[in-house]
C-alpha cells in the first residue's frame, strides 16, 4: 500500500494482511511476527494516516474514509462504463472493522516488543475509532450500516457487517454482535 499506486484501488487489502499475520502468529509466535513484519505493519498504518491517492484517508474521528466514483475501492465493487456499480463512498463497515483490528493488533505486538515510540503514537486511536464506529454504524434495527457517507448511513442489509463480528479485535458488544449475526443469517436464508 505504501508507495504502491495500484494498491490504492483495494483499500481493504492491506488490512487483511494484519488478519493473515494473526493466523500466522499461531504458528510462529508474536515475537517473530513483529521482528519480520513489524516495519511493514507500521508502514501500512502510516499510509492510511497520510492518505492514499486522494481517495483513502484516516479522519480525525479515527475512521477510514474512502471515496471514488471511478475506481472500485472495496471487494464488492465492479466498474461498468467507468463508474462503480455499487458506490460505497465514505466509511465502509468492513474496512473500519479491519482498520480497528489492525491497529489493536499492531499495538499489542509493539507493546510486547517494547516499541514504546509506536505505542505512544497510536495508543489513543482505538478508543476514538470504536466510539465513532458505534455512533455511526449501529442502527436501531439491530444491525450495522453498510457504509456512512456524506448523505448519511446506507442501511442496505449487506453481509459486509459480519466482518465486524469475526475479527480478533472487535468494537461491538456481545449483544450487538448477536443481532448482526442473526440479521446476516436471515439474509442468507432468504437468498438461498
Locate the predicted segments by residue.
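A structural signal for alpha-helical segments
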Residues: 5, 29-36, 87, 94, ...
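Short, surface-exposed linear patches
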Residues: 39-40, 80, 186-189
Amino acid at each position: 500500500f505504501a508507495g504502491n499506486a495500484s494498491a490504492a484501488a483495494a483499500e481493504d487489502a492491506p488490512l487483511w494482511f494484519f488478519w493473515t499475520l494473526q493466523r500466522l502468529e499461531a504458528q510462529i509466535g508474536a515475537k517473530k511476527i513483529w521482528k519480520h513484519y513489524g516495519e511493514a505493519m507500521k508502514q501500512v498504518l502510516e499510509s492510511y494516516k497520510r492518505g492514499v491517492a486522494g481517495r483513502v484517508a484516516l479522519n480525525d474521528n479515527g475512521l477510514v474514509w474512502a471515496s471514488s466514483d471511478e475506481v472500485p475501492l472495496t471487494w464488492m465493487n465492479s466498474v461498468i462504463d467507468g463508474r462503480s456499480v455499487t458506490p460505497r463512498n465514505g466509511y465502509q463497515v468492513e474496512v473500519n472493522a479491519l482498520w480497528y483490528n489492525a491497529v489493536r493488533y499492531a499495538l499489542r505486538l509493539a507493546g510486547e516488543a517494547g516499541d514504546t515510540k509506536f505505542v505512544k503514537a497510536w495508543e489513543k486511536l482505538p478508543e476514538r475509532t470504536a466510539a465513532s464506529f458505534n455512533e455511526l454504524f449501529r442502527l436501531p434495527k439491530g444491525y450495522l450500516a453498510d457504509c456512512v457517507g456524506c448523505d448519511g448511513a446506507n442501511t442496505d442489509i449487506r453481509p459486509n457487517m459480519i466482518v465486524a463480528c469475526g475479527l480478533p479485535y472487535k468494537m461491538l458488544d456481545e449483544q450487538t454482535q448477536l443481532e448482526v449475526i442473526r440479521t446476516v443469517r436471515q439474509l442468507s436464508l432468504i437468498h438461498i
